[in-house]
């Protein structure tokens, strides 16, 4: 039976920590989509591990890990990340990771094109990680991409990669700094190294579900970066919500037990795009500093602002969360008052809008309606149970819960693994 962990905002909500906490009960930990643009850190036994492409279930020595079919797979990063985990003391990682043979390959060519496309866009650039994710999904959808299983057919692999490179060379000319023959030569070695990890993920997941294995699925990025439901075009190139999980892992929807939405107690975003509750004044800077808001993948500072419950309600409508994990509540410890967005308002008519519009022009024209809640002005990291929290912190939790209509079962109160209050545990199916 499956538990799915999904980001409910624009990413960086703290999904990795919950994955780490739930992973000891899982037999398989899987990723469905995205690429090595995702990033999160996990602290286990006093050691910090960074994950980008690999599932964080590798921290659990008793857990198998799977990279699903909708992931765009950067082969050098795969081996580099495994080596770094070994250097930090994780053992047997090579025997606990499998890769779907249906994954598309994210080449260095795609990263080169990613940078050039951002330059083309100028002031309208997306703010990508520059790791080739968008171009990889573009070639996938254009049916010109290379899948993992094709790496093992040398003739097909080389022909398709040269065709890709030639197509981009025609578009960008000498601006494209890329040697296709060098990449082909590198893959002669990767072809041999990658073979033991490659699996038919459809059969693998079918057998696991038939046997009743406990499967933990960690979403990458977040709903508001979804190619269909996010703030398009300021999104990633994959389906980051529940639909992408089902497609990317061929998971049986009837065997999903829990869909846990992870939501930060405030809001952050990396890169360009709309962010209605962004605070460019003192509060935003304070959130950024106290929350250490800069990216694991890029090192870029995150834009910061107040919690947007319009976004969370929209995200919930799409992903159908059965429970929420509210993270980084402790970052709000020193705020006298805390603002929460409860609606948007048309400044022309004064009419309140409780939905999240698709049209970014309409979104930009709307004002935010805030509700102010009292802060608690005391540290909460040492709180171990829900009723250890100050009443103002509990009121904040309960306001969110009632507004969205989903139980908040996990509350993050600090950076460590043990800084997590479990509440309403009966809402989580074991």
From Swiss-Prot:
InterPro entries: Adenylosuccin_syn_GTP-bd, Adenylosuccin_syn_Lys_AS, Adenylosuccinate_synth_dom1, Adenylosuccinate_synth_dom2, Adenylosuccinate_synth_dom3, Adenylosuccinate_synthetase, P-loop_NTPase
Species, as recorded: Sordaria macrospora (strain ATCC MYA-333 / DSM 997 / K(L3346) / K-hell)
Main location as per UniProt: cytoplasm
GO molecular function annotations of the record: adenylosuccinate synthase activity; AMP binding; GMP binding; GTP binding; magnesium ion binding
GO cellular component terms given for this protein: cytoplasm
Active site, UniProt feature: 12, 40
Gene Ontology BP annotations: 'de novo' AMP biosynthetic process; cellular response to cadmium ion; IMP metabolic process
Binding site for substrate: 296-302
Binding site for Mg(2+): 12, 39
Protein name listed in UniProt: Adenylosuccinate synthetase
Cofactor-binding details, from the entry: Binds 1 Mg(2+) ion per subunit.
EC number: 6.3.4.4
Assembly with partners or alone: Homodimer.
Role description: Plays an important role in the de novo pathway and in the salvage pathway of purine nucleotide biosynthesis. Catalyzes the first committed step in the biosynthesis of AMP from IMP.
Residues the entry annotates as binding IMP: 12-15, 37-40, 129, 143, 221, 236, 300
Recorded family membership: Belongs to the adenylosuccinate synthetase family.
Record flagged with keyword Metal-binding: yes
Pathway: Purine metabolism; AMP biosynthesis via de novo pathway; AMP from IMP: step 1/2
Residues that hold GTP according to the record: 11-17, 39-41, 302, 328-330, 412-414
Keyword Cytoplasm: yes
